[in-house]
Every structure is written in structure tokens, then in C-alpha cells.
Amino acid sequence: MLTEDGKHLYVSYDEYHNLIEKLALKVYQSGWEFDTILCLARGGMRPGDILSRIFDKPLAIMSTSSYRANAGTQQGNLDIARYITTPKGEIAGKVLLVDDLADSGHTLKAVIESLKTNYAPITELRSAVIWTKQLSTFTPDYSVEYLPTNPWIHQPFESYDSMRPAQLLDKWKL
């Protein structure tokens, strides 16, 4: 649900999973066939996992990090992992790059540049995200929702960002 001022988008688990299914349909209806899904950790892991199951394709993972300060709301320097975790040797062929959103576009641009430079076995690369913000300088190949007001997206699992094991002990009285 988008707030009246357009500054915040609150997403339930059901909405989140429905959006991932719609993303799968966009990729499927394009007719493009790919060999591997490469998700960006952490935001792309949940959509990447679900798409991997729907398309029955191997899932590779590349860690990136740029949100650091104020519970992840302020972007810092972008760190991109040097290696990709994949179940079958080196990532190659046609790759679907998955993240949760194109916010500034900086992460997706930098990752694609890195992949093109460092992973010659990748013959074709397309990107898929759930949300694209208006301020993004990168346009993904596949996106479900365009967000013209650039809201902060409150994903359903965000409560775990500040939860610690001691809080779980209190909650579950174990």
C-alpha cells in the first residue's frame, strides 16, 4: 500500500509473492530463454529463489552491499563480490540477473559492467526486478511496478533487520 504522500510503499508477504509471480510471467511472455538465474544478495535472493523454482533453472548468487547507515536507508559505497556462487562450475551462457529493485540504478549498472568485463562465458545478460523507481538511471529488461514517487519500500521481512536472537528468546519464551 502506497501512503497518501507517496513516500512509503508497504508490501505484505502475499503482495510480495504475487509481484514475483508477475515478474516470472513478464520473463516467460517475452519468450526469452536463459540458462541461469543470478541473484544479487541480499535483495534479489528471495525473488531469485522463486524464479529459479518456477523456471527450473540453477540459481547463482553474487553478493553486493551498498545500504549501510540508518537501518539500511542511506546508501554507502558499493561492494561487489569478486566471486559468484553457482552449483555448476562457472556461470555461462544466457543469464537472468535478478534484484528486488532498481533504486538509483547504480548497483545494477555496476554489476552488469563487472559481469561483462570479468565473465566472458556469459553470452547474454538481461535484468529483472520487482520495482523500478523513477529516479533510477538504469532501466531493467523486466520490471513489474514503476514507482514515479520514489517511495521507500517497506518489504515484509524488514522487521528482521533490527531483530536479534535475544529478542527471539523473549518472544518465544525459550
Range-by-range predicted roles:
Residues M1-L174:
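PRPP-associated nucleotide enzymes
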